[in-house]
Protein backbone atom coordinates (compact mmCIF):
# COMPACT_ATOMS: atom_id res chain seq x y z
CA UNK A 1 0.00 0.00 0.00
CA UNK A 2 2.80 2.37 0.94
CA UNK A 3 4.61 1.62 -2.32
CA UNK A 4 1.39 2.29 -4.22
CA UNK A 5 0.95 5.66 -2.50
CA UNK A 6 4.57 6.61 -3.14
CA UNK A 7 4.25 5.62 -6.78
CA UNK A 8 1.04 7.64 -7.13
CA UNK A 9 2.67 10.65 -5.45
CA UNK A 10 5.72 10.40 -7.70
CA UNK A 11 3.48 10.24 -10.77
CA UNK A 12 1.50 13.27 -9.62
CA UNK A 13 4.70 15.24 -9.06
CA UNK A 14 6.04 14.20 -12.45
CA UNK A 15 2.84 15.37 -14.16
CA UNK A 16 2.75 18.62 -12.20
CA UNK A 17 6.46 19.38 -12.58
CA UNK A 18 6.27 20.99 -16.03
CA UNK A 19 3.72 23.46 -14.67
CA UNK A 20 5.18 23.97 -11.19
CA UNK A 21 5.80 27.60 -11.99
CA UNK A 22 3.80 28.99 -14.91
CA UNK A 23 4.94 32.57 -14.28
CA UNK A 24 7.30 34.16 -11.79
CA UNK A 25 8.57 37.69 -11.26
CA UNK A 26 11.33 38.38 -13.75
CA UNK A 27 10.01 36.05 -16.47
CA UNK A 28 10.03 37.32 -20.06
CA UNK A 29 7.26 36.07 -22.36
CA UNK A 30 7.33 36.37 -26.15
CA UNK A 31 4.24 35.50 -28.20
CA UNK A 32 3.70 35.46 -31.97
CA UNK A 33 0.71 34.63 -34.11
CA UNK A 34 -1.96 35.80 -36.53
CA UNK A 35 -3.58 39.08 -35.49
CA UNK A 36 -6.68 40.63 -37.05
CA UNK A 37 -7.82 44.23 -36.70
CA UNK A 38 -11.57 44.33 -37.30
CA UNK A 39 -12.82 47.95 -37.26
CA UNK A 40 -16.08 48.59 -35.44
CA UNK A 41 -16.15 52.01 -37.02
CA UNK A 42 -18.65 54.82 -37.00
CA UNK A 43 -18.08 58.08 -38.82
CA UNK A 44 -19.39 61.60 -38.92
CA UNK A 45 -21.00 62.89 -42.09
CA UNK A 46 -18.46 63.82 -44.75
CA UNK A 47 -17.76 67.56 -44.92
CA UNK A 48 -16.88 69.26 -48.21
CA UNK A 49 -15.80 72.83 -47.59
CA UNK A 50 -18.52 74.43 -45.46
CA UNK A 51 -21.13 71.89 -46.57
CA UNK A 52 -22.05 68.72 -44.71
CA UNK A 53 -23.18 65.77 -46.82
CA UNK A 54 -25.88 64.30 -44.59
CA UNK A 55 -25.75 60.51 -44.47
CA UNK A 56 -22.48 60.31 -46.42
CA UNK A 57 -20.03 58.19 -44.39
CA UNK A 58 -16.55 56.63 -44.44
CA UNK A 59 -15.71 53.01 -43.64
CA UNK A 60 -12.72 50.67 -43.25
CA UNK A 61 -12.24 46.96 -43.89
CA UNK A 62 -10.33 44.46 -41.72
CA UNK A 63 -6.79 43.10 -42.13
CA UNK A 64 -4.68 40.27 -40.70
CA UNK A 65 -0.95 40.46 -40.03
CA UNK A 66 1.81 38.95 -37.87
CA UNK A 67 1.27 39.92 -34.24
CA UNK A 68 3.94 40.04 -31.53
CA UNK A 69 3.66 40.35 -27.73
CA UNK A 70 6.52 41.05 -25.37
CA UNK A 71 5.76 40.75 -21.65
CA UNK A 72 7.79 41.16 -18.47
CA UNK A 73 6.45 39.78 -15.19
CA UNK A 74 6.84 42.40 -12.46
CA UNK A 75 5.40 39.99 -9.88
CA UNK A 76 4.09 36.42 -10.13
CA UNK A 77 0.68 37.80 -11.13
CA UNK A 78 1.28 41.21 -12.72
CA UNK A 79 3.10 41.88 -15.96
CA UNK A 80 3.79 44.71 -18.39
CA UNK A 81 3.05 43.84 -22.01
CA UNK A 82 3.79 45.50 -25.36
CA UNK A 83 1.71 44.65 -28.43
CA UNK A 84 3.40 45.03 -31.81
CA UNK A 85 2.65 43.83 -35.34
CA UNK A 86 3.63 44.11 -38.95
CA UNK A 87 1.83 47.07 -40.61
CA UNK A 88 -1.91 46.72 -41.17
CA UNK A 89 -3.38 47.88 -44.48
CA UNK A 90 -7.03 48.91 -44.85
CA UNK A 91 -9.21 50.05 -47.71
CA UNK A 92 -10.92 53.37 -47.02
CA UNK A 93 -14.42 53.43 -48.45
CA UNK A 94 -17.14 56.04 -48.86
CA UNK A 95 -20.88 55.46 -48.97
CA UNK A 96 -23.64 57.84 -49.91
CA UNK A 97 -25.35 59.06 -53.05
CA UNK A 98 -23.16 62.12 -53.61
CA UNK A 99 -19.74 60.57 -52.99
CA UNK A 100 -20.66 57.41 -54.87
CA UNK A 101 -21.69 59.49 -57.88
CA UNK A 102 -18.15 60.91 -57.84
CA UNK A 103 -16.41 57.60 -57.11
CA UNK A 104 -18.75 54.77 -58.18
CA UNK A 105 -16.46 52.08 -56.73
CA UNK A 106 -16.81 53.70 -53.30
CA UNK A 107 -13.08 53.26 -52.72
CA UNK A 108 -11.41 56.46 -51.58
CA UNK A 109 -7.97 54.92 -50.98
CA UNK A 110 -5.83 52.85 -48.66
CA UNK A 111 -3.95 53.45 -45.43
CA UNK A 112 -1.43 51.62 -43.29
CA UNK A 113 -1.09 51.80 -39.55
CA UNK A 114 0.82 50.44 -36.57
CA UNK A 115 -1.02 50.23 -33.22
CA UNK A 116 1.62 49.67 -30.48
CA UNK A 117 -0.14 49.13 -27.16
CA UNK A 118 1.42 49.08 -23.69
CA UNK A 119 -0.66 47.33 -21.02
CA UNK A 120 -0.60 46.21 -17.42
CA UNK A 121 -1.76 42.58 -17.29
CA UNK A 122 -3.12 40.59 -14.34
CA UNK A 123 -3.05 36.77 -14.07
CA UNK A 124 -5.52 35.60 -11.36
CA UNK A 125 -4.73 31.87 -11.40
CA UNK A 126 -2.20 30.15 -9.16
CA UNK A 127 1.20 29.82 -10.81
CA UNK A 128 1.01 26.01 -10.80
CA UNK A 129 -1.98 26.02 -13.17
CA UNK A 130 -1.38 25.14 -16.83
CA UNK A 131 -4.32 27.37 -17.74
CA UNK A 132 -3.51 31.05 -17.28
CA UNK A 133 -6.31 33.49 -18.16
CA UNK A 134 -5.56 37.20 -17.86
CA UNK A 135 -7.03 40.67 -18.20
CA UNK A 136 -5.24 43.86 -19.15
CA UNK A 137 -5.67 47.60 -19.49
CA UNK A 138 -3.34 49.93 -21.30
CA UNK A 139 -2.74 52.80 -23.67
CA UNK A 140 -2.56 52.68 -27.45
CA UNK A 141 -0.85 54.90 -29.99
CA UNK A 142 -1.93 54.37 -33.59
CA UNK A 143 0.38 55.73 -36.27
CA UNK A 144 -1.18 56.13 -39.73
CA UNK A 145 1.14 56.27 -42.73
CA UNK A 146 1.29 55.60 -46.49
CA UNK A 147 -2.19 57.09 -46.95
CA UNK A 148 -2.93 56.87 -50.67
CA UNK A 149 -5.89 57.76 -52.88
CA UNK A 150 -7.32 55.18 -55.23
CA UNK A 151 -7.03 55.74 -58.97
CA UNK A 152 -10.82 56.19 -59.10
CA UNK A 153 -10.68 58.95 -56.48
CA UNK A 154 -7.82 60.71 -58.25
CA UNK A 155 -9.72 60.52 -61.54
CA UNK A 156 -12.70 62.15 -59.80
CA UNK A 157 -10.53 65.10 -58.76
CA UNK A 158 -9.55 64.15 -55.22
CA UNK A 159 -5.98 64.91 -54.19
CA UNK A 160 -3.98 63.94 -51.13
CA UNK A 161 -5.10 61.79 -48.21
CA UNK A 162 -4.07 62.17 -44.59
CA UNK A 163 -5.21 60.32 -41.47
CA UNK A 164 -4.55 61.83 -38.04
CA UNK A 165 -2.65 59.69 -35.50
CA UNK A 166 -4.52 58.61 -32.37
CA UNK A 167 -4.05 58.01 -28.64
CA UNK A 168 -6.57 55.92 -26.72
CA UNK A 169 -7.25 53.31 -24.05
CA UNK A 170 -7.16 49.57 -24.75
CA UNK A 171 -8.64 46.65 -22.82
CA UNK A 172 -7.97 42.96 -23.29
CA UNK A 173 -8.78 39.46 -22.12
CA UNK A 174 -6.68 36.45 -23.01
CA UNK A 175 -5.42 33.05 -22.01
CA UNK A 176 -2.23 31.01 -22.12
CA UNK A 177 -2.20 27.24 -21.91
CA UNK A 178 1.20 25.84 -20.97
CA UNK A 179 2.18 22.94 -23.24
CA UNK A 180 5.54 22.63 -21.49
CA UNK A 181 7.32 24.64 -18.82
CA UNK A 182 8.27 27.17 -21.51
CA UNK A 183 5.93 26.79 -24.50
CA UNK A 184 2.32 27.95 -24.51
CA UNK A 185 -0.72 28.35 -26.75
CA UNK A 186 -2.21 31.83 -26.59
CA UNK A 187 -5.51 33.46 -27.57
CA UNK A 188 -6.49 37.06 -26.87
CA UNK A 189 -9.10 39.69 -27.70
CA UNK A 190 -8.67 43.45 -27.38
CA UNK A 191 -10.86 46.49 -27.80
CA UNK A 192 -8.94 49.63 -28.72
CA UNK A 193 -10.19 53.21 -28.70
CA UNK A 194 -8.95 54.73 -31.97
CA UNK A 195 -10.28 58.07 -33.20
CA UNK A 196 -8.97 59.74 -36.34
CA UNK A 197 -9.80 62.47 -38.83
CA UNK A 198 -9.36 61.86 -42.54
CA UNK A 199 -8.55 64.81 -44.78
CA UNK A 200 -8.43 65.09 -48.55
CA UNK A 201 -9.22 67.75 -51.16
CA UNK A 202 -11.74 67.84 -53.96
CA UNK A 203 -10.59 70.58 -56.27
CA UNK A 204 -10.00 73.50 -53.92
CA UNK A 205 -12.45 72.27 -51.29
CA UNK A 206 -11.20 70.58 -48.13
CA UNK A 207 -12.92 67.27 -47.43
CA UNK A 208 -12.91 65.92 -43.85
CA UNK A 209 -14.52 63.10 -41.92
CA UNK A 210 -14.16 62.01 -38.28
CA UNK A 211 -13.94 58.25 -37.78
CA UNK A 212 -14.17 56.27 -34.55
CA UNK A 213 -12.33 53.13 -35.68
CA UNK A 214 -12.65 51.35 -32.30
CA UNK A 215 -11.54 47.93 -33.57
CA UNK A 216 -11.81 44.50 -32.04
CA UNK A 217 -8.38 42.91 -32.27
CA UNK A 218 -8.07 39.11 -32.26
CA UNK A 219 -4.86 37.12 -31.95
CA UNK A 220 -4.08 33.40 -31.81
CA UNK A 221 -0.55 32.02 -31.61
CA UNK A 222 2.25 30.44 -29.63
CA UNK A 223 4.47 31.83 -26.91
CA UNK A 224 7.74 31.09 -25.16
CA UNK A 225 8.71 31.91 -21.58
CA UNK A 226 12.34 32.81 -20.88
What does each of the following model-derived ranges do?
Residues 27, 69-150, 213-226:
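Gram-negative (and chloroplast) outer-membrane scaffold detector with strong preference
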Amino acid sequence: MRKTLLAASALALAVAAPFASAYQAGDIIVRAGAITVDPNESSSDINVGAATLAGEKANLDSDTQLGLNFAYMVTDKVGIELLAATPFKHNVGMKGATVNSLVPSGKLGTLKHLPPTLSAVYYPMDSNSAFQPYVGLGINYTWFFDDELSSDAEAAGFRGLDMKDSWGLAGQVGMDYMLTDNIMVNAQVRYIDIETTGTTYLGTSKVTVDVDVDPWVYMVGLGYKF
